[in-house]
A protein has these predicted regions:
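Metallo-beta-lactamase
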Residues: 1-77
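Accessory terminal helices/loops
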Residues: 41-42, 55-125
Length: 125
């Protein structure tokens, strides 16, 4: 992330995705949520995400953060309830509908799997 305080421009790279479902394949989702909170602390005129459109609207950051938070917390609850990955995928359709204008629907399916696998207890043999 690069922040230009004089110009109030924030180059976020893959930390922000506007108009796309975030690709969290290699991300630490709780950390990504914390980073979004940190980004919101900066006075920013323009956000330049790694994917999507340039924006001056901080609500874009909030929307992405809230999406990741909802996804992460929902999957965590389902893992604690002992749900399978297939049962956990039930959350995808409502989230896709809520963010109907976003592209990259395949990233939502991938995110569900990545987060689910990261929360499952490790079994030692």
């Amino acid at each position: 992330m690069i922040y230009l305080p004089t110009d109030k421009i924030l180059f976020a790279g893959d930390l922000l995705w506007f108009g796309y479902f975030p690709n969290v394949r290699e991300a630490n989702v709780p950390n990504q949520i914390r980073v979004a909170d940190r980004i919101l602390e900066f006075p920013v005129r323009y956000y330049i995400p790694g994917h999507g459109h340039i924006s001056s609207d901080r609500n874009e950051v909030i929307r992405m953060r809230d999406f990741l938070t909802t996804l992460y917390e929902s999957i965590g609850k389902m893992v604690k309830e002992g749900k399978t990955l297939e049962e956990t995928r039930e959350i995808e359709e409502p989230l896709a509908k809520r963010n109907a204008g976003w592209r990259g629907r395949q990233f939502l399916s991938r995110a569900t799997e990545v987060i689910y696998q990261s929360m499952r207890p490790v079994t030692r043999v």
